[in-house]
From Swiss-Prot:
Its main location: cytoplasm. The lineage of its organism: Eukaryota, Fungi, Dikarya, Ascomycota, Saccharomycotina. Its cofactor is Mg(2+). It catalyses: isopentenyl diphosphate = dimethylallyl diphosphate. This is Isopentenyl-diphosphate delta-isomerase. The keyword Transmembrane helix does not apply.
Length: 284
C-alpha cells in the first residue's frame, strides 16, 4: 500500500507543481537557458558556514519530475533539496553509479566534509543529478513541445551522459575509462530522506536511475577533494563488515539499495540482464 507521502506526490499534476513552485522553469521554456541559475542570495542562512564552491553548485538546474518520472521543468539544486519543498512533494531525477573492477570489487566514495548534504557519509561510486539540458534529458535538440523527454530510453541515455560527466568531476575518471556504451541501466528507485536527523533543512527526494559500470583494474581515479573525502574498492564481504562498524555512516539511498538489491546484482555481474526492468521501485 502506498504511503501517505507517496499519495501526496502522486496527486500533484504538472500544473500543480508549477503553481506550487513558481521558481521551476517549465520544460517548454528551457531551450537556451544556462546549465545553472544565477546567484541567489535568498535563504542565505541555509548556507551559513558552507563551502563557496558547494554553494555555487546549488544553482545547477535539476530535472523536476511528476510522480511517473515525467519531466516538468528545471529547478535549482537548492530548491530541490530544501526539506520544506521535499515534504510538500517536490521530486527530481538522479542517478547512482556502481563501478566494479575486474576483480568484482565495488568502488565506494566517502562524501567530502564540504558537501552541503550528506557530508562525510560513505556511499556508492557516484550519485548525482542529470542537469535539465537536452543532452542529459536524452534528447538532441529543442525541448519545446518535445515528447521525447518522456521516453525511458532517452531518459536512460541522458542519465548515462550525466554519470560520465560526474565521474570525471568527482573522481577524475576520464571519459575513455567510462564510455557511455559500457554503462548498464538496471532500474529506478524512488526514495525520500532528510540529510541527517528529521530537523534537517536539507534532504533528498529522487527517482534514482541505477547504472552499473564494469571497468579494468587500472582505471585512473584522481579524486576532487571538494567532492570526495576518501575512496576505496571493497568486496561484498568487506562492505558487510563496514556496515557493522558503528563509526561509519552511509547515505540513506545506498543503504536502501543494499538492503533490497545490491548483493543480488553483485552475485550476478555477468548476468545483469535478468534484473533490468522499467519499474519505479517506491521505497517511501
Amino acid at each position: 500500500m502506498s504511503s501517505e507521502y507517496a499519495k501526496l506526490v502522486a496527486s500533484l499534476s504538472n500544473q500543480d507543481i508549477l503553481t506550487k513552485w513558481p521558481e521551476v522553469t517549465p520544460l517548454k521554456k528551457i531551450s537556451g537557458i544556462p546549465r545553472s541559475a544565477g546567484s541567489d542570495s535568498s535563504d542565505s542562512d541555509l548556507f551559513d558556514g558552507h563551502d563557496e564552491e558547494q554553494i555555487r553548485l546549488m544553482e545547477e538546474l535539476c530535472i523536476v519530475l511528476d510522480y511517473d518520472d515525467k519531466p516538468v521543468g528545471a529547478g535549482t539544486k537548492k530548491l530541490c533539496h530544501i526539506m520544506d519543498n521535499i515534504n510538500a512533494g517536490l521530486l527530481h531525477r538522479a542517478f547512482s553509479v556502481f563501478l566494479f573492477n575486474e576483480d568484482g570489487k565495488l568502488l565506494l566514495q566517502q562524501r567530502a566534509d564540504e558537501k552541503i548534504t550528506f557530508a562525510n557519509m560513505w556511499t556508492n561510486t557516484c550519485c548525482s543529478h542529470p542537469l535539465c539540458v537536452p543532452s542529459e534529458l536524452g534528447v538532441d535538440s529543442s525541448l519545446e513541445g518535445s515528447k521525447d523527454v518522456n521516453n525511458l530510453t532517452n531518459a536512460v541515455k541522458g542519465a548515462k551522459v550525466a554519470a560520465q560527466r560526474k565521474l570525471e568531476h568527482e573522481l577524475g575518471i576520464p571519459f575513455e575509462d567510462a564510455p557511455i556504451e559500457n554503462f548498464t541501466y538496471l532500474t529506478r528507485i524512488h526514495y525520500k530522506s532528510p540529510s541527517g536527523d528529521e530537523s534537517s533543512k536539507w534532504g533528498e527526494h529522487e527517482i534514482d536511475y541505477i547504472l552499473i559500470l564494469k571497468t579494468k583494474n587500472d582505471i585512473t581515479v584522481n579524486a576532487n577533494y571538494n567532492e570526495v573525502r576518501d575512496f576505496k574498492y571493497v568486496s561484498a564481504d568487506e562492505l558487510k563488515v563496514m556496515f557493522e562498524d558503528d563509526s561509519l555512516v552511509f547515505t540513506p539511498w545506498f543503504k536502501l539499495i543494499c538492503q533490497s538489491f545490491l548483493f543480488k546484482w553483485w552475485d550476478n555481474l555477468d548476468n545483469l540482464d535478468q534484473f533490468k526492468d522499467e519499474e519505479i521501485h517506491r521505497l517511501l
